[in-house]
Design a protein with these regions (language model features):
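Structural helix-boundary/capping segments
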Residues: 13-18, 25, 33, 67, ...
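Serine-dependent amide/ester hydrolase catalytic core
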Residues: 1-78, 130-137
Length: 139
């Protein structure tokens, strides 16, 4: 990625960012009507570390692999609106399933407040060691 980035002129970068800025403005309009958007974090249950290989220099292949597994997070990574992943559920193998909550620009406090309420209603912190052990089994 870094090598490809060095080949891009500043003017091309500015032009390439215009759709990203339009996306951010469109999402912001949605948040004028809704406080929080809920979506899954991943398109499928979590997999063990090392299952998905991102070892390619082909940017198109990299993006395809990434968006196939995680199609929901990129829009907010790109637009800059705050989001959080909360492990509210588990698979049958006890792996965490993330619920992604997103909010308007500057509404991080809303997400922190929501996270606190969700943690009280369904605590997940105690299961972190179990999750770590399961995810690291293959390393």
């Amino acid at each position: 990625m870094a090598e490809n980035g060095n080949k891009i002129a500043a003017s091309d970068y500015v032009n390439a960012m215009k759709p990203t800025h339009r996306l951010g403005h469109a999402l912001q309009k949605m948040f004028d009507q809704y406080d929080v958007l809920l979506s899954p974090v991943l398109a499928s249950p979590p997999v063990k570390i090392g299952t998905i290989k991102m070892n390619t220099n082909d940017m198109k292949t990299y993006v395809e692999r990434l968006t196939k597994y995680s199609p929901f997070t990129g829009i907010f990574n790109q637009s800059g609106q705050p989001s959080m992943s909360v492990p509210l559920f588990r698979t049958k193998d006890n792996l965490p399933v993330g619920s992604m909550f997103s909010a308007a620009f500057g509404d991080e406090n809303l997400l922190f407040s929501l996270a606190g309420q969700l943690e009280q209603a369904q605590p997940w912190a105690k299961s972190l060691n179990v999750m770590r052990e399961i995810l690291l089994e293959t390393i």
